[in-house]
């Protein structure tokens, strides 16, 4: 089946190839994508400016100071190699802190990095509620790995005690994301930003007490990855590199602090209001909730909480739901050297994303927090093709009703209705090639990989179209920002 997936991708990956066909000659984007990029960049600048104003009247509460610092770091484009991509570029509030550009959601599913011709192989996850994921561990009773962040759980949280903080350390040095060649470049640039005094107030005056080499600017302006013979191209003394590493950790912990704040992890959905007795579901929403907890089996992985648990709508494990490969991922076309000689995807058209199993077997080549506990390596085979079960909170949050969101690890699905229909009919409808006119209604492409595919909870749920709609209606109640109607 995996070979079959390769054939399909090679046959229909035309749009992915066309996106990068001009990769050495400028920005290969449509006018719609360019307009949306500009809109998001302007929005990021506005949020950053509004946050910088708050430096003039800092709260006395250190937790609030950390949250403000984390927000400033998250919205700072200067922390990317070309000074054009903040962390928030892929995680904006109006889209539920995930991808805010409908054109990419509708087409590629993944997003470009600071080097705009380099795309990731995965859809951006939400960072809302991410700090509530536990440190990655093996649950003997379940026989499952539980926790961590990223689709493949590689931000384990075991070093910093928080998977969200370790996740925040990945994108700055990922060549297909923010693209810095050395983590110390992020520290160097932060030391020259208006929030430096706040950082030193929170973390100590020694945070930026680093003797930077005279060529640091030039080194940090060159996109990663670093040369194989010079893996740490900012040539610091061992003492200064240790201090830079500690400060980089503190930057990440600040970002996780902001992600933990009520501004991001809010618990203000209609669902929460209903549970608090402040609102009521409609008949359709209630039907969807009953299906969610019963016939549709959603609650078996997207748990709404047990006694003493927050209703997180994930069990923090991983699963292979049999998602088809997304042939429109530009990553398939990144098998040749780009203008800077970098090859992001050494497998080219034969790339298969093996998820958690791939991380356990080989680590993750594109970003920093990828240390694998040797005790977990034997678990690689039983985790091939599995991806972390995402929270469903804010799964439908969008800036406007017709805004397209992408779903699953590779952004293959383009609506909640479509992915619910897939869960319902994966094993009922016949197979077809990607981009078949009947795709998604009368047939489905083959799974990207059938390894460890979930067959007990996905594939043949026996739901009617009306029941699918009811499930969607319920999931829409998980959008934060709900204001209960005033009692008469």
Annotate each language-model stretch with its function.
Residues 2-5, 15-488:
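Periplasmic c-type cytochrome electron-transfer domains
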């Amino acid at each position: 089946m995996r070979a079959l997936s390769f054939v399909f991708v090679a046959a229909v990956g035309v749009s992915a190839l066309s996106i990068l066909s001009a990769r050495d000659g400028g920005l290969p984007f449509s006018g719609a994508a360019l307009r949306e990029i500009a809109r998001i960049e302007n929005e990021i600048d506005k949020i950053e400016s509004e946050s910088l104003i708050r430096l003039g009247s800092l709260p006395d509460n250190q937790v609030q100071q950390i949250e403000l610092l984390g927000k400033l770091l998250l919205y700072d484009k200067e922390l990317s190699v070309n000074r054009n991509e903040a962390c928030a570029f892929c995680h904006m509030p109006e889209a539920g802190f995930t991808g805010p550009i409908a054109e990419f959601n509708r087409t590629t599913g993944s997003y470009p990095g600071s080097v705009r011709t380099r795309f990731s192989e995965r859809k951006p996850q939400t960072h809302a509620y991410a700090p509530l994921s536990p440190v990655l561990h093996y649950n003997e009773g379940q026989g499952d790995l539980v926790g961590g962040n990223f689709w493949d759980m590689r931000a384990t949280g075991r070093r910093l005690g928080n998977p969200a903080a370790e996740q925040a350390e990945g994108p700055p040095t990922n060549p297909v994301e923010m693209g810095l060649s050395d983590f110390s470049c992020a520290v160097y640039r932060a030391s020259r930003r208006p929030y430096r005094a706040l950082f030193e107030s929170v973390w100590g005056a020694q945070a930026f007490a680093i003797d930077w080499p005279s060529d640091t600017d030039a080194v940090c302006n060159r996109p990663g990855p670093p040369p194989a013979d010079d893996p740490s191209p900012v040539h610091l003394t061992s003492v200064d590199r240790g201090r830079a590493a500690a400060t980089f950790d503190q930057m990440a912990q600040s970002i996780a602090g902001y992600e933990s704040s009520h501004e991001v992890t809010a618990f203000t959905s209609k669902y929460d209001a209903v549970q608090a007795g402040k609102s009521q579901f409609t008949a359709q929403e209630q039907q969807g909730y009953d299906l969610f907890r019963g016939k549709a089996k959603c609650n078996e992985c997207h748990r709404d909480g047990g006694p003493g648990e927050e209703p997180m709508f994930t069990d923090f494990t991983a699963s292979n739901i049999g998602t088809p490969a997304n042939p429109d991922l530009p990553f398939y076309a990144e098998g040749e050297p780009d203008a800077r000689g970098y090859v992001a995807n050494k497998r080219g058209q034969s790339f298969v994303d093996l998820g958690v199993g791939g991380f356990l077997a080989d680590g993750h080549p594109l970003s920093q927090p990828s240390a694998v506990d040797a005790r977990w390596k034997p678990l690689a085979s039983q985790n091939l093709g599995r991806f972390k079960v995402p929270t469903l909170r804010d799964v439908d949050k969008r800036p406007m009703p017709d805004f397209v969101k992408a779903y699953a690890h590779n952004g293959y699905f383009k609506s909640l209705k479509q992915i619910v229909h897939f869960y319902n009919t994966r094993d009922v409808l016949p197979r077809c090639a990607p981009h078949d006119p009947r795709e998604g209604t009368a047939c489905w492409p083959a799974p990207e990989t059938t390894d460890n595919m979930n067959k007990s909870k996905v594939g043949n749920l026996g739901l009617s179209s009306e029941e699918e709609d009811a499930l969607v209606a319920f999931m829409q109640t998980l959008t934060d920002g709900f204001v209960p109607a005033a009692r008469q």
